Amino acid sequence: YQPDTILINNTGLEGRGQLGNIELDSVTFERVKPQPINLADSPKYIASEMCEVTCDHWGYAREDLNIKSPALLIEELCACRRYGANFLLNAGPMGDGSLRPIDAAALGILGQWTALFGESIHAPRPSGIAVSGRRRDFLLQDGKSYYLFCFGLDMTADEHVALQAAGE
């Protein structure tokens, strides 16, 4: 018996998000978007998490330049918080422990976003209030504060400052 041990259902791709054993403390969805977990019959709170990588590999791959955009990673972070899940982001370090400049830049942008909007994702929990008409949008709640997350909001601008002018 080890009371300070955290048990996770990291059983591979077949058991993603499944509660399974009553002793579990957390379930993982691996690289699949989290879903609600039914805790009605659970004697305790069970955390959940989704894992993601900045590129196409879990570890360091010198020639892997297929980096995910910071916008996509931010959307995935927010999608995790929709269900109260944690977002684990991997950037494979090089042999000396440092990050490639491209990975460091992506993480830096996520850090900038979190500095601006972290209040909306750290403490708030799922509100249970549905947002009608937009499947991906959702509300989080922290006490009397609500945070609306809207996805797919295109930027419109004058043709002199945007690649695609409004209405095209």
Kindly give the residue locations of the regions a language model identified.
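Mature catalytic domains of secreted/periplasmic carbohydrate-active enzymes
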Residues: 1-168
